[in-house]
């Protein structure tokens, strides 16, 4: 599909398909950061090519890290195979890259963060290890994304920072002393991950203590810790305290898992249509928060079967609403709200206040769009309640430049006629999403 501003999802077709999902954005950008502070070359296989990962790669290049694209080898191509469409198999070719880090980074540059939280919260810490000034800027909506956790922490670590939100400038001195640090920030787990990922290059390592309100999306911090240990970094965690010791890292060969969060709309779409979707290369063990789909979707009435490397989700014809604490999996909330909108009984999702600070205020956006279709949805500071009703109005589903809002509109569009504005915002994490969606759910 050529770039398009408007997209009308296929309506009312029972889905029966198999597909492979592109590599995980969250894993890709974590491995890229660590590869940039290692000694020696690293190769990353099945790297996701999307706006967020391209911004990370370009940011690393701008501070002096050499990154080369290699000829892709392997079988983790992305595509859909369904009874009516086999032409989309191998639609998206993943990438293999070689990262050649610099021993000492010296630079004076500008880095575009777009709307990528991993870029704006991971790279500034690495910039603090550089000798020179790095200015960070981004999309218009980036200014509303909280940055206090990262920038206040850098200041406490002795790094000069001008500004409190996008745009801001980090003035690195070539090293960070490290040591003990306390933080009370709780609007995003990425603040913790960003500090941990580069901490083995701090002169004295890092002992990071979080106090105050619970952190959201804790599985993403667990993912960070697992990635660090994969690289041989000594990191421990106990009672809200993470400790990282200094270490010189060697290069590695890394293979990126499929992005399980990007599988969510396709799995949910199968439930909505009463069909069946098989996701290939599903890991048997993973740190990705998308793994919780295995437990959550059956609560809505889905049937799930697994093999050694696949998962199949089938709709039963009935969708039951649920009450659930989704604080640990905020990225999945918009798609689950879309599913709940099409259920037969009410749903309540709580402890999700942090998703107000994602690419857009996702709680407000979901209330606005579902209400505009005639749905019944209410919200508070940190919860959403959906009372299923017949959607009575067609119209344009606004995405707010948010990829999860776009995929949520696509789910509802399987049952109710609508047009999605700016479907290409999905390229943030899932290039050519609309082509794959039409292939999976079209006639």
Curated annotation (Swiss-Prot):
GO molecular function: 3-phosphoshikimate 1-carboxyvinyltransferase activity
Protein name (record): 3-phosphoshikimate 1-carboxyvinyltransferase
Residues at which phosphoenolpyruvate binds: 25, 117, 145, 190, 362, 404, 428
Keywords from the UniProt entry: Amino-acid biosynthesis, Aromatic amino acid biosynthesis, Cytoplasm, Transferase
PANTHER family: AROM/DEHYDROQUINATE SYNTHASE, PENTAFUNCTIONAL AROM POLYPEPTIDE
Subunit text: Monomer.
Pathway: Metabolic intermediate biosynthesis; chorismate biosynthesis; chorismate from D-erythrose 4-phosphate and phosphoenolpyruvate: step 6/7
Gene: aroA
Localization in the cell: Cytoplasm
Active site: 331 (proton acceptor)
Pfam families, sorted: EPSP_synthase
Class of the enzyme per the UniProt entry, highest EC level: transferase
InterPro entries according to UniProt: Enolpyruvate_Tfrase_dom, Enolpyruvate_Tfrase_sf, EPSP_synthase, EPSP_synthase_CS, RNA3'P_cycl/enolpyr_Trfase_a/b
Entry coiled-coil feature ranges: none
Enzyme Commission number(s): 2.5.1.19
Family to which this protein belongs: Belongs to the EPSP synthase family.
Function: Catalyzes the transfer of the enolpyruvyl moiety of phosphoenolpyruvate (PEP) to the 5-hydroxyl of shikimate-3-phosphate (S3P) to produce enolpyruvyl shikimate-3-phosphate and inorganic phosphate.
Main location: cytoplasm
Organism: Tropheryma whipplei (strain TW08/27)
GO cellular component: cytoplasm
Entry's Gene Ontology BP terms: amino acid biosynthetic process; aromatic amino acid family biosynthetic process; chorismate biosynthetic process
HAMAP family linked to this entry: EPSP_synth
Residues reported to bind 3-phosphoshikimate: 25-26, 30, 188-190, 217, 331, 358
Catalytic activity: 3-phosphoshikimate + phosphoenolpyruvate = 5-O-(1-carboxyvinyl)-3-phosphoshikimate + phosphate
């Amino acid at each position: 599909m050529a770039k398009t501003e408007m997209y009308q999802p296929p309506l009312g077709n029972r889905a029966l398909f198999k597909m492979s999902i592109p590599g995980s954005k969250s894993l890709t950008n974590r491995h890229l950061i660590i590869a940039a502070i290692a000694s020696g070359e690293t190769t990353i296989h099945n790297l996701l090519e999307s706006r967020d990962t391209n911004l990370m790669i370009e940011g690393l290049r701008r501070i002096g890290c050499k990154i080369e694209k290699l000829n892709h080898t392997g079988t983790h191509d992305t595509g859909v195979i369904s009874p009516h469409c086999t032409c989309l198999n191998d639609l998206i070719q993943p990438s293999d890259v070689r990262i050649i880090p610099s021993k000492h980074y010296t630079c004076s540059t500008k880095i575009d963060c777009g709307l990528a939280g991993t870029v704006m919260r991971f790279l500034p810490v690495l910039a603090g290890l550089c000798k020179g000034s790095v200015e960070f800027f981004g999309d218009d909506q980036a200014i509303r994304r909280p940055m206090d956790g990262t920038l206040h922490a850098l200041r406490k670590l002795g790094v000069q920072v001008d500004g409190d939100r996008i745009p801001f400038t980090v003035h690195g001195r070539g090293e960070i002393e490290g040591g003990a640090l306390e933080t009370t920030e709780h609007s995003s787990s990425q603040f913790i991950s960003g500090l941990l990922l580069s901490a083995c290059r701090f002169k004295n390592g890092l002992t990071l203590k979080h106090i105050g309100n619970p952190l959201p999306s804790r599985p993403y911090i667990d993912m960070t810790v697992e990635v660090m240990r994969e690289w041989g970094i000594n990191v421990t965690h106990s009672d809200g305290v993470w400790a990282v010791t200094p270490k010189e890292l060697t290069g590695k060969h890394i293979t990126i898992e499929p992005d399980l969060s990007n599988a969510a709309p396709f799995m949910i779409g199968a439930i909505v249509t009463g069909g069946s979707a098989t996701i290939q290369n599903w890991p048997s063990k993973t740190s990705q928060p998308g793994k919780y789909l295995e437990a959550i979707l059956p609560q809505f009435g889905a049937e799930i079967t697994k093999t050694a490397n696949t998962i199949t989700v089938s709709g039963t014809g009935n969708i039951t609403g649920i009450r659930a604490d989704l604080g640990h999996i905020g990225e999945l909330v918009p798609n689950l709200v879309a599913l709940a909108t099409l259920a037969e009984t009410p749903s309540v999702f709580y402890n999700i206040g942090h998703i107000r600070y994602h690419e857009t205020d996702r709680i407000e956006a979901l209330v606005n769009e579902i209400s505009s279709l005639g749905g019944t949805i209410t919200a508070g500071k940190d919860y959403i309640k959906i009372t299923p009703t017949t959607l009575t109005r067609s119209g344009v589903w606004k995405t707010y430049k948010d990829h999860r809002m776009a995929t949520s509109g696509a789910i509802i569009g399987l049952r109710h006629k609508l047009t999605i504005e700016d479907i290409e915002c999905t390229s943030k994490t899932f290039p050519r999403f609309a082509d794959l969606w039409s292939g999976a759910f079209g006639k």
